Amino acid sequence: NIAEACKGFKNHPTSILNFLEGTRRTSAKQLNQSSDYKNLLKPKIGGIEYVIKDMGDYLHKLIDVTIVYPDGTPTFWQFVKGECRSVKFVVSHYDIPKQVLVDNDIERRSSLSGWIKTIWMQKDQQITEMTQTTNVP
């Protein structure tokens, strides 16, 4: 239960991992989802919304990690076996906006959705720029 976990986190320095795409992106998943993004699936904000609702006053930053495989996305087993020769990471830090920390559920969800959409548009453009000079499909 997210709410129970968040109660325990309030008493300790904590980092919470949340994967907004929910799964690894494939071309088929992207087509099926009718994503607005060239390189990303639509973000799912339900999990992060619960965390912000329960821990908003305790959270200060969102750290976004973008991972790009210049030689093409490996399968899990290729990655584990070391057959992935190159991986690029971009780490971005964002202050959590005050309008995302409001008590009203509707306002919070709307603000959070808009904020994440802005981050996703920047992230999508960043991936496009990173892959223009490589062979990533």
Language model features with spans:
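A Trp-anchored, charged/polar loop motif used as the substrate-binding/catalytic surface
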Residues: 1-7
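A cross-family acyltransferase "interaction/gating" segment
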Residues: 10-103
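Accessory terminal regions of nucleic-acid processing enzymes
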Residues: 102-137
